[in-house]
Amino acid sequence: KVEEELRELFPEAGILRMDADTTAGGHEEILQTFERERVPILLGTQMVAKGLDFENVTLVGVLSADISLYVDNYRAAERTFSLLTQVVGRAGRGGKTGRAVIQTYTPGNDVIRCAARQDYDAFYESEIRMRRLRRYPPFADLFTVTVSGTEEGRVLRAAVSVRETLRQLCRRPELAAGEPEVLGPAPAPVVKVNNRFRYRCTLVGKNDKATREMLAWLQKDFAKDSANRGMNLFVDHNAAD
């Protein structure tokens, strides 16, 4: 759709497109064409932002820049800031004046504002303050306990049972000192994968021996319970995605 709009707006301009539909070998060829033949417009996904250094690029635009802020991951702000600063940094690299235009529904968001200014210190202060408030790493550890199975109702009921078990276990003195908190269950961001539904609980606590042993016991106990036949339970620590 964006390519169609660009061709209507700039019918005489050459446009190159680089995204997942172009082959890996084609990426290099596209970039060489963009640089060598001075094709004025390069349209692409996030891959365009990373590691490209063209001195004649003077204008960069980012569409829906804040979408990645609202994914269910504690690193969302950091990743969005990193991506936007890379994009903004593509313009004006050869001594020419550069300009970046960022489309956003939340122009007052600290991440967007700091990225537009390339203000790393201000972003760090804002992000570290938010992580401390929410008990995100590095101030605590996040363990995602996911239950999966083919019947959504059973999966949800099992996840509720896992939550209650976790809350009981976290009352033990060796765990309570870390002020653990159990959240959920909630559907995974992509709730159904390969015909299996996924619901998960989140344990906020410390990555210490007592916690690891408790989670290992939980996995074994879940697996041997006949009520959980056909379902799986797995644990991620500070999950990247």
Walk through the language-model features, giving the residues of each.
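Conserved RecA-like helicase motor-core motifs
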Residues: L9-D21, P173-L183, N232-F234
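A short, contiguous, amphipathic alpha-helix enriched in charged residues
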Residues: A13, R154-C170
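Nucleotide-binding motor/catalytic cores of P-loop/tubulin-like NTPases across gene-expression machines
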Residues: C170-E179, V193-F197, K209, F222
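Short amphipathic alpha-helices in soluble, non-transmembrane regions
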Residues: A158-E164, E213-D221
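Inter-lobe coupling/hinge segments of SF2-like helicase ATPases
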Residues: K1-L156, P189, R200-C201, K209, ...
